[in-house]
């Protein structure tokens, strides 16, 4: 969330940033609303001050036996007490209206983010590896999985409807191996602390990371009022909600392997076959909490950690710098890792790593204090996938497919597969 004081002082900067995102200018409406709110706040404070002063004057008048003045002052106090609740309610309404408006404004892109309308304006940062060269015709993951006999969309549909998958036997183990491999890599080599956190959260947590109020339709809400997490970013980032951290202890780096739940409300007709776009999927999430000076460098580090997963698995990928029109609501800059899928003959996103500055921290009221500082500053937050497990499984199936229809297990996963080196058709 942006600071209204900053908006008052940087109205043109805000409108220019919104224009880069393809949004209409908002600064003047926000400033007008804030001026109205500040005016009523001043009125409330003036009434409260006059009420308190008049109350003291009543005592002085009574001491001087000036009954006429005392009665006049009592009438003034009574009038203030009558008017004050309405003014306080107006202040509350205007404050809520302003906060709601501020909560719906996207973050300000960094200056080096490419300006564009959508994904077609994203820029290739670099790539790694090469596309596999085969004699056989590539297949899509759902063809491979069904032919192996371990991927069942029909049974999943009977259980839960569309956009779900049942994996069994060797593919279920491969999915588990991928998640465990990612978690071990990030905790053992990359310095992240593993966290086991709830899969259901309150409104406040979803607001803190920016899912609410603007993107409520993208998530699932229980009848009890909890939300199923669309990503572990929600829980990991909110671990510091309301805290004042010691700068010396930053950065904090958290990781979690969890299911994620998404309604895919805006994805009708897209990726309807297979596992690419599911209502439920596993993901290894990375979150960093830094001071203001370190967040840009941490963004590069986090992205490199996610890249290492794909390098260890021998998967060709490219890193894209997202344009302003394709970047997420809370991000100041985002790198997408796109893995090569031979079956689709294209690159698909497998990880998204974003630096959010203090945007989420303001919503969560998460701060830090330097060793010699009296005041506090908002922390900076970063999040990324390290990586999406289901999409990584898709990439392994399509890139490690053999001529006979079997799939070779990548070397990095062998310690997790109980000696299984090749996934073959079910007997």
Swiss-Prot record:
Consists of two distinct domains, a catalytic core and a N-terminal extension that is involved in tRNA binding. Catalyzes the attachment of serine to tRNA(Ser). Is also able to aminoacylate tRNA(Sec) with serine, to form the misacylated tRNA L-seryl-tRNA(Sec), which will be further converted into selenocysteinyl-tRNA(Sec). HAMAP family: Ser_tRNA_synth_type1. One of its GO terms (cellular component) is cytoplasm. One of its GO terms (molecular function) is serine-tRNA ligase activity. Its EC number is 6.1.1.11. Homodimer. The tRNA molecule binds across the dimer. The keyword ATP-binding applies. Belongs to the class-II aminoacyl-tRNA synthetase family. Type-1 seryl-tRNA synthetase subfamily. Pathway: Aminoacyl-tRNA biosynthesis; selenocysteinyl-tRNA(Sec) biosynthesis; L-seryl-tRNA(Sec) from L-serine and tRNA(Sec): step 1/1. It catalyses: tRNA(Ser) + L-serine + ATP = L-seryl-tRNA(Ser) + AMP + diphosphate + H(+); tRNA(Sec) + L-serine + ATP = L-seryl-tRNA(Sec) + AMP + diphosphate + H(+). InterPro entries: aa-tRNA-synt_IIb (IPR002314), aa-tRNA-synth_II (IPR006195), aa-tRNA-synth_II/BPL/LPL (IPR045864), Ser-tRNA-ligase_type_1 (IPR002317), Ser-tRNA-synth_1_N (IPR015866), SerRS_1_N_sf (IPR042103), SerRS_core (IPR033729), tRNA-bd_arm (IPR010978). This is Serine--tRNA ligase. It is found in: Cytoplasm. L-serine binds at residues 231-233, 285, 385. It holds the Pfam family tRNA-synt_2b. GO terms for biological process: selenocysteine biosynthetic process; seryl-tRNA aminoacylation. CDD domains: SerRS_core. ATP binds at residues 262-264, 349-352. Keywords: Aminoacyl-tRNA synthetase, ATP-binding, Cytoplasm, Ligase, Nucleotide-binding, Protein biosynthesis.
């Amino acid at each position: 969330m942006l600071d209204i004081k900053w908006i008052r002082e940087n109205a043109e900067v805000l409108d220019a940033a919104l224009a880069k995102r393809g949004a209409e200018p908002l600064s003047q409406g926000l400033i007008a609303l804030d001026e109205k709110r500040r005016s009523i706040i001043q009125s409330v404070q003036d009434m409260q001050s006059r009420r308190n002063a008049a109350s003291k004057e009543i005592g002085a008048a009574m001491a001087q036996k000036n009954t006429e003045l005392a009665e006049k002052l009592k009438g003034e106090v009574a009038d203030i007490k009558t008017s004050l609740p309405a003014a306080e309610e107006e202040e509350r309404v205007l404050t809520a209206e302003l906060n709601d408006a501020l909560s719906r404004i996207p973050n300000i892109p960094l200056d080096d983010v490419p300006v564009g309308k959508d994904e077609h304006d994203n820029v290739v940062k670099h790539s790694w590896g090469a596309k596999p060269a085969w004699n056989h015709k590539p297949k899509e993951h759902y063809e491979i999985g069904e032919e192996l006999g371990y991927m069942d969309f029909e049974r999943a549909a009977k259980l839960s409807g569309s956009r779900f998958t049942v994996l069994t036997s060797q593919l279920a183990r491969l999915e588990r191996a991928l998640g465990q491999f990612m978690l071990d890599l990030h905790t053992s080599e990359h310095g992240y602390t593993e966290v086991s956190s709830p899969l259901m959260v309150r409104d406040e947590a979803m607001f803190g990371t920016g899912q609410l109020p603007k993107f409520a339709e993208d998530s699932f809400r229980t009848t009890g009022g909890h939300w199923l997490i669309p990503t572990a970013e929600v829980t990991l980032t909110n671990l510091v909600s309301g805290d004042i951290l010691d700068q010396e202890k930053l950065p904090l780096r958290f990781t979690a392997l969890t299911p994620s739940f998404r309604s895919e409300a805006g994805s009708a007709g897209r990726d309807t076959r297979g596992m690419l776009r599911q209502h439920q999927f596993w993901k290894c999430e990375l979150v960093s909490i830094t001071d203001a000076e370190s967040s840009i460098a941490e963004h590069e580090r986090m992205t490199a950690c996610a890249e290492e997963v794909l390098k260890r698995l021998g998967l060709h990928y490219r890193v894209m710098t997202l344009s302003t029109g394709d970047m997420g609501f809370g991000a100041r800059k985002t790198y997408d890792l796109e893995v090569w899928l031979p079956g689709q003959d294209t690159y698909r996103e497998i990880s998204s790593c974003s630096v959010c500055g203090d945007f989420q921290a303001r919503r969560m009221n998460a701060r830090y204090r330097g060793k010699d500082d009296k005041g506090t500053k908002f922390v900076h937050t970063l999040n990324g996938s390290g990586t999406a497990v289901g999409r990584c499984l898709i990439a392994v199936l399509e890139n490690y497919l053999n001529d006979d229809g079997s799939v070779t297990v990548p070397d990095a996963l062998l310690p997790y597969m109980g000696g299984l080196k090749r996934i073959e058709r079910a007997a």
